[in-house]
């Protein structure tokens, strides 16, 4: 199966059904990237070129050898400080105020099965389906440790990549950039394929020549966004849907991201993907670690169609979970366009009757069933059934609809709060906002601080009380605005840069608790339509 270490060549070779991925530990302990592409045998270090490149820095270990420079060598996990002036994958501020790190090889481990990422969505697999490679790296001066994680699913030609950063210094360090995956290509002319858009017009394909300099897409919005999808393809020039070689990266994450392709002075190309670095600053005390969300990699020598199929098969079989994983999803009608906020329980029942006549499987009661929610100015955060509006209990309404042979679903927007709500009046500090500044609003609402455990717990308890009232088989989880005013009562000062990422972890925690405690629940992850159409959300949906 998939992973072989050669002691004589100091190479790691990952073999999938149709591809080969190879790395090598060089004489100085740096981990070089040798090859990724069509399946092959042998050691690919002949692809490396050692030449005196003017003004390219040489590490001390290389002595007077001016042909050795990390500024031109392909690397597996490039960092700042080593003389490589291309965009790094990892950057940090050390306890003494210096920048960057110098990671050298320490050891490795190969095991059956696929690694897990606590608190994060990730591809999963049985022991016989996958293997994991862990490569241990260390900065000999500061003691910083990094574990590079590779999950290999040979049948799909998919390799997942993540990394764990561990602070062993006596004092605090601060991560300022954390990308999960990087591939350096020494040779080749490429096109970059990305997917742009806006609300109600997401994921339009754009194909751009990879010229000198950097091409960057990403999201600073706190979600993966309508504007750019966290997926990127690097394709050889002649690649079509059915022929040619191409490489894909898909980020298994639902927050801010950055995907970058950089072509350097010598025509080499670096592709990387991971967390958005703007407003990201993550301190680690001694003994603490940071896990970078994973990226799915795939390579196809049979065109873009095969690349898409690789990712689709892996996502459907080894990322999606739950009761509906292998089932046809129900056909539903949603009350929003039919009623907006103006409805009673009887209106929803009549909608279900008509749905039954049309062969529709489910009715979803959208916005307006809770608190004082009769328009979009109030009520968000108060997840208590408005029985006066429904003219009865939610449980009775669900029972009547189920008696028709129609399933029932319900809308929530768990991450949001209106200032005109009981929750906000009781806990104004639970909203993300900067003290002393009037917050930016979107759709007349603020965002709850899901980086805080007590906020997540409070919303969870409210949702459970509603879900326990009847046979609710479907939840439409909405999220109708982006993050602004990044202020938190818990994460402020030198910890303010944690908020973006911790917020996403809070969303994942709540969704994991819901699908665990309500295993028959089908969760639809809506975000104003397609602002969270990413692999991370598919893990819970």
Q: Can you describe what each PLM-predicted range is?
A:
Residues 1-12, 265-285, 520:
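Short acidic, Pro/Gly- and aromatic-enriched capping/linker segments at domain boundaries
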Residues 5, 10-17, 21, 31-262, ...:
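Polysaccharide-binding surfaces and accessory modules of carbohydrate-active proteins
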Residues 18, 163, 287, 333, ...:
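Conserved, mostly hydrophobic/aromatic
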Residues 19, 26, 168, 178-180, ...:
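An acidic- and aromatic-residue-enriched active-site/binding cleft used to recognize and process polar
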Residues 98-105, 282-301:
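Short Pro-Gly-centered flexible turn/kink motifs
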Residues 298-330:
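Terminal connector regions
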Residues 324-464, 474:
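Aromatic-lined carbohydrate-binding/catalytic grooves of carbohydrate-active enzymes
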Residues 386-393, 399-403, 424-541:
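Active-site neighborhood of glycoside hydrolase catalytic domains
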